[in-house]
Swiss-Prot record:
The lineage of its organism: Bacteria, Pseudomonadati, Pseudomonadota, Betaproteobacteria, Burkholderiales. The chain crosses the membrane at residues 7-27. It is a single-pass membrane protein. It catalyses: [GlcNAc-(1->4)-Mur2Ac(oyl-L-Ala-gamma-D-Glu-L-Lys-D-Ala-D-Ala)](n)-di-trans,octa-cis-undecaprenyl diphosphate + beta-D-GlcNAc-(1->4)-Mur2Ac(oyl-L-Ala-gamma-D-Glu-L-Lys-D-Ala-D-Ala)-di-trans,octa-cis-undecaprenyl diphosphate = [GlcNAc-(1->4)-Mur2Ac(oyl-L-Ala-gamma-D-Glu-L-Lys-D-Ala-D-Ala)](n+1)-di-trans,octa-cis-undecaprenyl diphosphate + di-trans,octa-cis-undecaprenyl diphosphate + H(+). Keywords: Cell inner membrane, Cell membrane, Cell shape, Cell wall biogenesis/degradation, Glycosyltransferase, Membrane, Peptidoglycan synthesis, Transferase, Transmembrane, Transmembrane helix. Pathway: Cell wall biogenesis; peptidoglycan biosynthesis. It comes from Janthinobacterium sp. (strain Marseille) (Minibacterium massiliensis). GO terms for biological process: cell wall organization; peptidoglycan biosynthetic process; regulation of cell shape. This is Biosynthetic peptidoglycan transglycosylase. It is found in: Cell inner membrane. The gene is mtgA. GO terms for cellular component: peptidoglycan-based cell wall; plasma membrane. InterPro entries: Glyco_trans_51, Lysozyme-like_dom_sf, PBP_transglycosylase, Pep_trsgly. It comes from the Bacteria.
Length: 231
């Protein structure tokens, strides 16, 4: 029986404790970021390591700028494109998740996530790019931690500064400079709409900027963005 108890301890209790400690780390780290800007994210570090495998001197293009120095055009375009209910939900849009789940069942694999802006931020800050229901569950937990600690404006500010916008391009300022040679504060509505549309697949659109889909989707977001509610 002693051997069985020890076995159960190592197989069940220890893994559970490790998972709880990991959640505590996430919780405290998010609390720190309420008043301190993250210098990088898990996803940024992962992408940098990939770039440096080909070029050891490779660096990311990234510059943090305050929320009030980012064009409202870009904020509205991203909300219109990525998460129209951002200002209203509590971090998770369960209707969108249900639709994604049904799509995944139909396809027989995970092809859609139904993620909100807060969920995307949770993934970028801490998680890998793998698609699995286990990772999705962790994403939801971190999402609620973000919503517990931060108001919507702070969540959106961090998102705008760390989201990927191309090969080695992270954040609104780097994206504005990379694609248009202007600061994020100077982005016009058409520029902002195009940047927003790139977000689901930024590395692809970095190299394929003239696709018909990008043009059609940009026109759609231009029509929708004025009604997007900012936090």
């Amino acid at each position: 029986m002693k051997i069985l108890r020890k076995l159960l301890f190592w197989l069940i209790v220890v893994p559970v404790l490790l998972v709880l400690l990991l959640q505590l780390y996430f919780f405290l780290q998010i609390g720190w970021w309420v008043n301190h800007n993250p210098g990088s994210t898990s996803f940024m570090r992962h992408q940098l390591s990939i770039l440096q495998e080909k070029n050891p001197k490779a660096q990311l293009k990234h510059k943090w700028i305050p929320y009030n120095r980012i064009s409202n055009n870009l904020k509205r375009a991203i909300i219109a494109s990525e998460d129209s209910n951002f200002s209203e939900h509590e971090g998770v849009d369960w209707d969108a998740l249900q639709k994604a789940y049904e799509k995944n069942i139909k396809k027989g694999k995970v092809v859609a996530g139904g993620s909100t802006i807060t969920q995307q931020l949770a993934k970028n800050l801490f998680l890998s790019g793998d698609r699995s229901y286990l990772r999705k569950g962790q994403e939801v937990i971190i999402t609620y931690m973000l919503e517990y600690w931060m108001d919507k404006e702070r969540i959106f500010e961090i998102y705008l500064n760390v989201v990927e916008w191309g090969v080695g391009i992270f954040g609104a300022e780097a994206a504005a400079q990379h694609y248009y040679g202007v600061s994020a504060a100077q982005l016009g509505a058409p520029q902002a709409a195009r940047l927003a549309v790139m977000l689901p697949n930024p590395r692809f659109y970095d190299g394929h900027r003239g696709t018909a889909y990008l043009a059609r989707r940009t026109d759609l977001i231009l029509r929708r963005m004025n009604s997007a509610a900012l936090p």
